[in-house]
């Protein structure tokens, strides 16, 4: 017998990937992510889902059948950046979406090409790190708050990107050490940042470090705040241009070293900004 249950989702724009969260007793809090249709290379209506319940199923397959038909009630299920309530049932090897009620379209992103590609990059980044049978609640919460930040004019998109990347690394257990020297655990004094070493290195330990980046207090404090802050408070500050440039240089090196995939959305984004 097919199991039917209610979900909440946030869609992206590639019709391949959904992230969802299901809570106990049939009600749920979830995010459903779908990447750009033109770049997906999969059948229309097909997706992967992250489901949250007592078993933490992780990534699962899902379908929105007939979503591209004119006047289809499931059109919201495949529109980019939509958040809402989904009803679906579980089949033998996949889940099928039966109905959808969209509560937030994030329409600002659809009207802003650069903002949209930032969003696609975050979704592709998250999909790279999330895995089957994992509890991905924190990553999905980060994605939702990041999409909200992208619709705000008060924080630069580049800062949103660097905050997202650093926090995503932390959620995945790969965040850099920004509170003490990675070698001797010294907590005070002048430090440099080494991506290869995985964080701060004090001047006494940095003699053989070839990739050390000198850090000012403002940049270091910014990184510390991002790592320890709750997700809800991540996008509540701005920084100077100098701090953003330094933070960007650090995260560029860190991503190059620890992210093995080259994201298509990022390639396009870099041609636009």
Task: State the predicted function of each range.
Residues 9, 29, 168-169:
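Enrichment for repetitive, rod-forming helical segments
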Residues 1-25:
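Compact, basic/aliphatic-enriched, mixed alpha/beta core segments that act as assembly/interaction modules
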Residues 43-45, 53-273:
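Non-catalytic alpha-helical scaffolds and adjoining flexible linkers that form interface surfaces
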